[in-house]
Amino acid sequence: AVIDLRKDSKTYGEIVHQVIAPTTGDEFHHFGWNACSASLSPLSGHAFLERRYLIVPGIRSSRIYIFDVKDPLKAKIHKVIEPEEVFEKTGYSRPHTIHCGPEGIYVSTLGGSGEDGTESPPGIFIMDCETFEIIGIYELDRGEQDKHYDFWWNLPQDYMVSSEWGLPPQFENGVVPEDLVGGKYGHKIHF
């Protein structure tokens, strides 16, 4: 929904436009832009990219929506990436957080392969910031990391920091008390 935040407007505080997703059960989570300061660097190859598209992951469905918000009062779905494409090109599921970066759009996931997302570890994949095609996985070697959550990087030092949360069975239907007490949720950061 688009809410009017212009204080002098007659529709201030009201919903002035909506975009309805064509499917149910996606559970939208941690949206992000196609362009930001990390992607607009002259060294990135797309220094003049327009901050126009909102990337919205469906954490339960593994579907990703690309919303064109150039005109917020006419926002619309530009593209939908279906779960099968995410699985096929990355081996990951449950996309969680979107960050734009120097090589494209980075997407952290909470699930790996398999129906419940636990047959392989989750991770990060990259999408092209102009075509929104999935390029592939980011990690060359994830080391011992078997859970994932959010991430950010120190570009001048050329390293990424990522955190852990839990695997899909540990959050999709609420916290699992035994896992919480047993220390089975994520509690590390990785560099």
Task: For each feature predicted by the language model, list its residue ranges.
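Beta-propeller domains
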Residues: 1-37, 47-49, 56-82, 119, 141-191, ...
